[in-house]
C-alpha cells in the first residue's frame, strides 16, 4: 500500500510557491511513487489551524499529477475561501490524504469516528446532492455519527428537514486515508537539510 510521505507535502508547497512567484513548475520528486490513487490536499493556517482550502478527487490520478493539480486547486480555487496569497504561505500547514479501502454501507452509523471518512449522495427530488468528510473531520469537530451525517447533508447544500428517513436513504461510502501533515517551518527545514533551494 502506498502511504503519504513528507515529499508529497513538500512538493505541494513547492507547487504553490512556484505559482505565486510565477516560476516554472517544480519536477515531481522521485520519492513520489508513480501510482494512481484518489487524493485530497488540505491547507490550514495559523496556530488554530483554520481551514484555508481542501479539495481532492475520488478518481485514480497519477500521484505527481494529482498532487500538482489539487495543491493549486485547493489553494487558489476553493470557492469557500479567497485564494491563498504569497504573504500567507509562511503560516500554512499542508495535509496530503491518499484515499483507500472504499466500502459501501447500508446503515449511516456503520463507520468509525477517527478511522473512516464518509462520502454520501442522495436525490432531494430536484437534484442530486453529494458531499464528503475526510476521516479526521468528525473527530476534530467532536461530532457523533448523527451530527456528522447532518453536517454532511448541509454541506451538500440541502436546506430541508433532516430526519432518520432521510439519513437512512443516503447512499454512503466509507473509506480510510493515509495522511501526512507538514507545517511551513518543517517544509523549510526539510529543504535546508536536503540542500534544496528555499522559496523566495
Curated annotation (Swiss-Prot):
It comes from the Eukaryota. InterPro entries: AMMECR1, AMMECR1_dom_sf, AMMECR1_domain, AMMECR1_N. Disulfide bonds: none annotated. Residues 1-191 form the AMMECR1 domain. Gene3D superfamilies: Hypothetical protein ph0010, domain 1. This is Uncharacterized protein R166.3. It comes from Caenorhabditis elegans.
Amino acid at each position: 500500500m502506498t502511504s503519504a510521505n513528507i515529499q508529497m507535502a513538500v512538493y505541494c508547497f513547492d507547487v504553490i510557491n512556484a505559482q505565486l512567484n510565477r516560476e516554472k513548475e517544480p519536477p515531481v520528486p522521485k520519492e513520489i511513487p508513480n501510482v494512481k490513487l484518489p487524493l485530497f490536499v488540505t491547507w490550514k493556517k495559523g496556530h488554530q489551524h483554520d481551514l484555508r482550502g481542501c479539495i481532492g478527487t475520488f478518481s485514480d490520478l497519477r500521484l505527481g499529477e494529482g498532487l500538482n493539480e489539487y495543491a493549486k486547486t485547493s489553494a487558489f480555487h476553493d470557492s469557500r475561501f479567497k485564494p491563498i496569497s504569497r504573504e500567507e504561505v509562511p503560516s500554512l500547514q499542508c495535509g496530503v490524504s491518499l484515499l483507500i479501502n472504499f466500502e459501501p454501507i447500508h446503515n449511516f452509523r456503520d463507520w468509525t469516528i477517527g478511522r473512516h471518512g464518509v462520502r454520501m449522495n442522495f436525490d432531494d427530488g430536484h437534484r442530486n446532492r453529494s458531499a464528503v468528510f475526510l476521516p479526521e473531520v468528525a473527530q476534530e469537530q467532536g461530532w457523533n455519527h448523527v451530527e456528522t451525517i447532518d453536517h454532511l447533508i448541509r454541506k451538500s447544500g440541502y436546506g430541508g428537514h433532516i430526519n432518520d428517513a432521510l439519513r437512512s436513504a443516503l447512499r454512503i461510502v466509507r473509506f480510510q486515508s493515509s495522511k501526512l501533515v507538514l507545517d511551513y517551518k518543517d517544509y523549510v527545514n526539510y529543504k535546508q537539510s536536503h540542500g534544496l533551494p528555499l522559496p523566495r
